[in-house]
Amino acid sequence: MQSPIRHDWSLEEVEALFALPFNDLLFQAQVTHRRNFDPNEVQVSTLLSIKTGACPEDCKYCPQSGHYNTGLEKEKLLEVEKVVNEAKAAKEKGASRFCMGAAWRNPRAKDMPYVLEMVKQVKSLGMETCMTLGMLTADQASELAGAGLDYYNHNLDTSENYYGEIITTRTYSDRLETLQNVRDAGMKVCCGGIMGMGESARDRAALLAQLANLPSHPESVPINMLVKVKGTPLEVQEDIDPFDFIRTIAVARILMPRSHVRLSAGREDMNEQMQAMCFLAGANSIFYGEKLLTTPNPEADKDMMLFKKLGIRPEQREQAHSEDQQEAYLHDVIQAHDQQQRMESMFYDATKTA
């Protein structure tokens, strides 16, 4: 039985979830997760920076901002062929989704034809496509949707109340407008935030409430842990407590039960035990590879070793091209479902009352 979808969460309700005893919160999140997903599958995505550095925005966490001296080498927009080759390599390593990010305030008209061609060619590989290019007009969103872009990433970063402490060059309403343009164009939304930027527990609750109360939940919700980069204003920010981060994952899972909750930036600084707790709390998506745009990420082989230890497998994006393939795929799905049913029959759901 899938969990009901709500869009009317009060801040007090969300704060009450954060305040639950840790074990109770994780139990509730895990039950919600199992009702909506295979608990042992994790979506694997790869992220490529297609244009690096010299961004005019002043996001205090970002090494790509032109406002700070972080030593980052600027790069122009990559050639389409190079992007496609990177996507092929990612697919060979097990990625089912390929995400492309550009350090822009918004895409310029002269760059759009190249960006659209990237989408078309990566899509032709049988991969899901995602982009993050900054703010979008309604027309730009329609162009991307027409090229076949599946997802558009545009994070809210933090609560509306704390937002001005982190970014001043674009408003919270600017971000919400881009999200609406993406939705109106028919694309799926990838939207989350960054934890550990000095925000309060109430700010974390407010961010998740904002996401859960959107007209449609984001299909992907990246929960990032701040990566402190030398030269940015947040380089000396105090670390977030790991339990507070795991709580954020768990509450996101409960509020948005059918969304992929992505364990995103910051994994390089998490040990295996913390990552395992995040998966238990409902995270079921990761970025895979050695870099997230410009910050380190666990090596792909380390991820697969962790998956093996935990009995986790990558989520597959199946594309059957013949009746035989379709029949084989359906047979595998039925077998997996039967196995899951047998496993569930060995346990009882303590959340159900007689």
From Swiss-Prot:
Keywords in alphabetical order: 2Fe-2S, 4Fe-4S, Biotin biosynthesis, Iron, Iron-sulfur, Metal-binding, S-adenosyl-L-methionine, Transferase
Pfam families linked: BATS, Radical_SAM
GO BP terms, alphabetized: biotin biosynthetic process
Cofactor binding mode and count: Binds 1 [4Fe-4S] cluster. The cluster is coordinated with 3 cysteines and an exchangeable S-adenosyl-L-methionine. Binds 1 [2Fe-2S] cluster. The cluster is coordinated with 3 cysteines and 1 arginine.
Required cofactor(s): [4Fe-4S] cluster; [2Fe-2S] cluster
GO molecular function: 2 iron, 2 sulfur cluster binding; 4 iron, 4 sulfur cluster binding; biotin synthase activity; iron ion binding
Pathway recorded for this protein: Cofactor biosynthesis; biotin biosynthesis; biotin from 7,8-diaminononanoate: step 2/2
Catalytic activity: (4R,5S)-dethiobiotin + (sulfur carrier)-SH + 2 reduced [2Fe-2S]-[ferredoxin] + 2 S-adenosyl-L-methionine = (sulfur carrier)-H + biotin + 2 5'-deoxyadenosine + 2 L-methionine + 2 oxidized [2Fe-2S]-[ferredoxin]
InterPro entries: Aldolase_TIM (IPR013785), BATS_dom (IPR010722), Biotin_synth/BioAB (IPR002684), Biotin_synthase (IPR024177), Elp3/MiaA/NifB-like_rSAM (IPR006638), rSAM (IPR007197)
Subunit description: Homodimer.
Protein name: Biotin synthase
Species of the source: Hahella chejuensis (strain KCTC 2396)
Taxonomic placement: Bacteria, Pseudomonadati, Pseudomonadota, Gammaproteobacteria, Oceanospirillales
Gene designation per UniProt: bioB
